[in-house]
Every structure is written in C-alpha cells, then in structure tokens.
Amino acid sequence: MGMRMMFTVFLLVVLATTVVSFTSRRGPKSRRGEPVPTTVINYGECCKDPSCWVKVKDFQCPGASPPN
C-alpha cells in the first residue's frame, strides 16, 4: 500500500469511529458500564393526575384542562 492509500484508510477509520460514537445513545457514564437514566412518561397515568400536567406542558389530555 502506498502512503496515500494508508492515509485514506486512516481517515475512513477515524470518520467511522466518530460517527458511531456520536450516533450511539450512550452518555459519558456508559463507558464505565453504568446505565444512563431515562425518564419515561406514561401519558395515560399522567392524565389521571393533575399535578403531572405541570411537568408535561406540551401534552394535552383529552377532555381535560390543565390547572391555572
């Protein structure tokens, strides 16, 4: 392999590892094997609890109005 070909392969490897690291959903903690916490909102349960409406401002429960 020539020098130009080796440089091209090197750039492709660097690009591939960069793309993989940015597209994975892991945070910096996952490198140590710790899970990254996520928040999942159950909208059915949230509709039953008016105090939950304050946390979820962009969701409107059907037939309900958020507190003022």
Swiss-Prot record:
It is found in: Secreted. Residues 22-44 form a propeptide. Keywords: Disulfide bond, Secreted, Signal. Residues 1-21 form the signal peptide. Expressed by the venom duct. It comes from the Eukaryota. One of its GO terms (cellular component) is extracellular region. Disulfide bonds join C46-C52, C47-C61. Belongs to the conotoxin A superfamily. Does not show activity on all the human nAChR subtypes studied. The cysteine framework is I (CC-C-C). Alpha4/8 pattern. Both the globular (with C1-C3; C2-C4 disulfide pattern) and ribbon (C1-C4; C2-C3) isomers shows no activity on muscle-type alpha-1-beta-1-delta-epsilon/CHRNA1-CHRNB1-CHRND-CHRNE nAChRs, alpha-3-beta-2/CHRNA3-CHRNB2, alpha-3-beta-4/CHRNA3-CHRNB4, alpha-4-beta-2/CHRNA4-CHRNB2, alpha-7/CHRNA7, and alpha-9-alpha-10/CHRNA9-CHRNA10. This is Conotoxin G1.9. The lineage of its organism: Eukaryota, Metazoa, Spiralia, Lophotrochozoa, Mollusca.
